[in-house]
From Swiss-Prot:
Keyword Ubl conjugation attached: no
Swiss-Prot/TrEMBL catalytic activity: apo-[citrate lyase ACP] + 2'-(5''-triphospho-alpha-D-ribosyl)-3'-dephospho-CoA = holo-[citrate lyase ACP] + diphosphate
GO biological process per UniProt: prosthetic group biosynthetic process
Keywords (A to Z) from UniProt: Nucleotidyltransferase, Transferase
Enzyme class: transferase
Membership in a protein family: Belongs to the CitX family.
UniProt-listed InterPro entries: CitX
Its job: Transfers 2-(5''-triphosphoribosyl)-3'-dephosphocoenzyme-A on a serine residue to the apo-acyl carrier protein (gamma chain) of the citrate lyase to yield holo-acyl carrier protein.
Native organism: Streptococcus pyogenes serotype M3 (strain ATCC BAA-595 / MGAS315)
Pfam families: CitX
Stated name of the protein: Probable apo-citrate lyase phosphoribosyl-dephospho-CoA transferase
EC number, as in UniProt: 2.7.7.61
Entry's Gene Ontology molecular function annotations: holo-citrate lyase synthase activity
Protein's UniProt keywords contain Nucleotidyltransferase: yes
């Protein structure tokens, strides 16, 4: 499966992305204030380049959302919102689960799912009246690894160590492998 299969959506401008980030921060703040007793999960995808959406990326996004809902099946979910802007898919969930426990579940999910590395599963709390993300390292988790070289992702991102083309190719390979495995297990389920 070629890269175009995954990156076939509409290209966006930097100004669109900046506006979307601002709107996301406002939405997060609103939800944290509206549900002060709950924990907020904000889900987006790590998709480099000007194309943030496509039918296949939406399929990946929805697979992860379903996995989140399954992981939280025993916990009270107070609110859910799924948005599909061209600037990248967004999902918000408020649960009664303490934020620390929610973050630990999301770290486990990111690790267990082969496509978990493509997601930002941010657990947010209010700090000085602003949304603040709980870091995986604060909870004893290791920093996220780069798709390409397995070094710390933040360092590679800050240094722009890899081109958009390299990252998209790595993501395409990951997704191709994921969907092929998924299709093989579906086929063997039917023949078994």
């Amino acid at each position: 499966m070629c890269k175009d299969t995954y990156f076939s959506g509409e290209a966006i401008q930097l100004s669109d992305m900046l506006r979307a980030r601002e709107e996301r921060a406002l939405r997060q703040l609103h939800l944290l204030k509206e549900y002060p007793e709950g924990s907020l999960l904000s889900v987006t995808m790590n998709i480099p380049g000007p194309i943030k959406t496509s039918p296949k990326l939406l399929e990946v996004f929805d697979i992860v959302i379903k996995a989140i809902q399954t992981a939280l099946a025993d916990d009270k979910i107070c609110y859910q919102l799924r948005l599909l802007p061209t600037t990248g898919y967004e999902y918000y969930l408020i649960t009664s689960l303490p934020s620390r426990d929610l973050k630990l579940k999301m770290i486990a999910l990111e690790t267990e799912l082969p496509i978990g590395r493509l997601m930002d599963l941010d657990v947010l709390v209010l700090q000085n009246d602003l949304p603040h993300s709980i870091s995986r390292t604060v909870l004893g988790g290791s920093p996220r690894q780069c798709f390409i070289c397995s070094k710390e992702a933040k360092v590679c991102g800050r240094l722009r160590k890899h081109s958009v083309e390299e990252m998209q190719t790595a993501i395409s390979k990951l997704l191709h492998s994921f969907f092929n495995k998924d299709n093989q297990s579906s086929s063997s389920d039917k023949t078994g």
